[in-house]
Amino acid sequence: MKSEVSSDAPKRQENLKGVLLNPEAIGASKSFPKEVEMIASKVSNEFSHLCSDTNKQQRDLNSNGTEQEKNLVVHKKRKNQQAGTSYAQSCEVKENQRLLRLQPQSDEDNDSSFSDCISSPSSSSHFGDSDTMTSDEDKDNPRRYSPAGVNATPRTQSARAQKWPRPHTDSVSSLVMKRPCYQVSSLRRPLHRKRFVKNVSSQRTQKQKERMMLQRKKREVLARQKYALLPSSSSSSENDLSSESSSSSSTEGEEDLFVSPGENHQDGTTLPSGGMDEDVVVIEASSTPQVTANEEINVTSTDSEVEIVTVGETYRSRTTLGHPRSHWGQNTQSGRTQEQRTRNRVSTVIQPLRQNTTEVVDLTVDEDDPTVVPTTSGRVESQPVSTVSSNTSTSEPASDSASGPLGSRGSAIPEIPPIPPNSNTVGTIADDSRTSTSGTNVDGGPPAMPRLPSCCPQHSPCGGSSQNHVLGHPHSSCFPPHSHHFPHHHHHHHQSSHPGVPLSPSFRDSHCPVERNAAVPPPCGATSSSGSTYHDPQALPVDLSNNGIRSHGSVSFHSTSAFDPCCPGSSSRSTVYGHQSTTSTAQTMAIDGYGSSMVAQAQPPPPTPLSSCRHYMHAPYTSLTRPLHHQTSSCPHSHSNVGDYVIAHQVPFISPLPSLAATHAVPPPPPSHHLSTAAAPQHLSTSHQSMSHHISATAPATQRLHTHEVIQRMEVQRRRMMQHPTRAHERPPPHPHRMHPNYGHGHHIHVPQTMSSHPRQGPERSAWEIAIETGVTAAPYQTGPLHTHLAHYHAPPRLHHLQIGALPLMVPDMAGYPHIRYISSGLDGRSFRVPFRGNFEELIHLEERLGNVNRGASQGTIERCTYPHKYEKVSTDWFSQRKLHSKQDGEEATEEDTEEKCTICLSILEEGEDVRRLPCMHLFHQVCVDQWLITNKKCPICRVDIDTQLPTES
């Protein structure tokens, strides 16, 4: 290896520059996407000072030998790198330590330590190394390739051979020793390598292709050997191998890149994912630019390679745009964008297939909370498998491969105890979608998804932010302890269904730190195949309720989890049901994983998790929103009412609702049958019939109250009512027709006070009543207890005559009426009296006001319609005329006849008094008539309305 690498790095650099200066080659190769170009330019600008020629010269002189060796080793890593970026980080950390020590370790040590990285296709050490290596390699290659591609071939071949197979200890040891030089090499000519590679990439020979094939075979053999050691490696390893082979050899061009000048190119590709990670560990600044250059180069390479690069780009691009790899840095803030987290997580998702569980633990270190999540090897395996396939192959193959891994996963998962069966798949899917939507994710990913509180170690947020995940599936990793068994196969949701969905970060943390970031914004097009739309942003990877069992093939309850951290104490933690994947694989997966991966379902989950995981209904799906019973029952599983209640599991209540905390033991295998609303009797145990944990839409089925119990309750109510005689006599006499269920609703509930305020004792108290006391609003109508209460509204004496059969009929008829809401809101006398009394008083006042408006006149109306003036006695002529007439009539005219009186006060009108003449010409004192008109607009004498027009003669 060393002998092949020439020590005159500066010369190589010069050669490389010469190649780069070749405009034709550059133009020809310059086919990479705008994104990459932008990133490359940005990186070059940012890091120009770091990568200045003088610095490069010095670095070259200082680390020629080490870099050269490193370059060879990098090939090896680079190959690994194709598989995935995630594992690289852990390997980088390990190897960086060695590098810092700069101690030449024995070949065996190096091989073993590096074997992890090498063994896993995604080992990240190659990333950082590849970056370094590529730059060095570029130096070597320019000499070899620019003169002739042939020279490069032997070297590249040897490099390739070492690159993948661990057996080459030389490369490993040299690589380990050389690692310290990463900084120099990585900083060095980020862009040069790209261009040069482009020129070289065109040079491909049949020999190179053959070498690629051989190399591929070797890798497969190694992979099989590695997987033979893993517990459930059989299926996943095959998938991994196939995906691996596809990634490495999906296009011969890719292999050519390895073998030939393309090799540098390949390195560049690897670099974006791995170089970033490792370099960042060593030199954050340099790593980003390197990544950019590498990404560009990758783009120019063949399709499969580009895809791989795309994965890297997605991670990288996010990071490249400004986030130096902080995956290992604990200084990273929880607020860092999800892009960053997603990238890191994704790399984790891409974890090497060959990695052991302990190694995986290292990888899962979370940026924000470095708690290491020991993920079992099984999880890792399946994850890398699907990931590799998704990354390597085009989006279509990705979905296929993903499905394959899922299937294999189903078998493998049982062996893996607490690992959510689908989380890895999700991660892979996430990778897949990420590859397809790298451009989208580059600029900004959805904010990092909140991590579940550490109190719920079992709820490790799902490792994968699959496209489906983005939809807000409670992450499968969250499944565990919560009693609601719904293995989320949502991970199995069609991987390809949401290519454009920003992937939610795949959380591996089993510790569920409570620091929840903003929920991932629903991806625009990301609707699970089930057709359920993205749930609220709140749909954070929440409850692990195993939806798999419950899942209706077509109904995807995206559980929007009202995302309360599932701290043991927080009863509010709502888990949402992960959307049920419609894919059959998911179904079987969920069931298989159910036994093994789900926390022992047979044993009732500890009450604490139960209380914490209260499932709220998904708002969009609740056709009959009944938030009530959710709060009511301790751990009510909000069945999003998608048209059917999924009463998958009987929930026998262990405690008679001493508190809202739910402590219902979950029967080990929750029945997977889904009852539709129409015929889903809510399982109200007879003893707790009043506790309508899940209120089914059909009242009759729900009502399981025995006749004698109903009669007893009625009697109790009647007695209570009799204790309040004032209320009793206030009730209108019961009318027989009112007993009919169809009687005009609301009329028979005249006096709500019948419901006495005495709290019911023990079993009498229904769940919704308890909810009412706790201030929870009740469902629009409660089937079971409600009937008896409705009966109570009828006249007490006749209650015992009410036939039980009629009661269920009442509910459907009354469902839409407001009084039902009052009843459901609280049948305790206390709750009812206040609202009803207030309403009655308001009605009285309203009636009075309306009466005033209808009968009385405002002062303005009075002034407008009447004629106020000073009273004047009629002229003598008029009196004389009257006297004459009266005399003629034989009557004596007296003075009294000539005087006018106010008919209201019956006093004679005096000269100069304020009087008001109404349109009817009647005259009154202003004071007297105004008081009258305020209450009645009509004349007190003739009852003519003052609004009428005055006669013209007046």
UniProtKB/Swiss-Prot annotation:
Pathway: Protein modification; protein ubiquitination. Transmembrane segments: none annotated. A zinc finger (RING-type) spans 902-943. Binds free ubiquitin non-covalently via its RING-type zinc finger. Ubiquitin-binding leads to enhance the E3 ubiquitin-protein ligase activity by stabilizing the ubiquitin-conjugating enzyme E2 (donor ubiquitin) in the 'closed' conformation and activating ubiquitin transfer. Coiled coil: none annotated. GO terms for biological process: DNA repair; epiboly involved in gastrulation with mouth forming second; prechordal plate formation; protein ubiquitination. It comes from the Eukaryota. Its main location: nucleus. PROSITE patterns: ZF_RING_2 (PS50089). It is found in: Nucleus; Cytoplasm; Nucleus, PML body. Disulfide bonds: none annotated. Pfam families: RNF111_N, zf-RING_2. Zn(2+) binds at residues 902, 905, 925, 928. A motif (SUMO interaction motif 3 (SIM)) lies at residues 360-364. Residues 867-869, 917-921 are annotated as: Ubiquitin binding. It catalyses: S-ubiquitinyl-[E2 ubiquitin-conjugating enzyme]-L-cysteine + [acceptor protein]-L-lysine = [E2 ubiquitin-conjugating enzyme]-L-cysteine + N(6)-ubiquitinyl-[acceptor protein]-L-lysine. Belongs to the Arkadia family. Monomer. E3 ubiquitin-protein ligase required for mesoderm patterning during embryonic development. Acts as an enhancer of the transcriptional responses of the smad2/smad3 effectors, which are activated downstream of BMP. Acts by mediating ubiquitination and degradation of SMAD inhibitors such as smad7, inducing their proteasomal degradation and thereby enhancing the transcriptional activity of TGF-beta and BMP. Specifically binds polysumoylated chains via SUMO interaction motifs (SIMs) and mediates ubiquitination of sumoylated substrates. This is E3 ubiquitin-protein ligase arkadia. The lineage of its organism: Eukaryota, Metazoa, Chordata, Craniata, Vertebrata. The gene is rnf111.
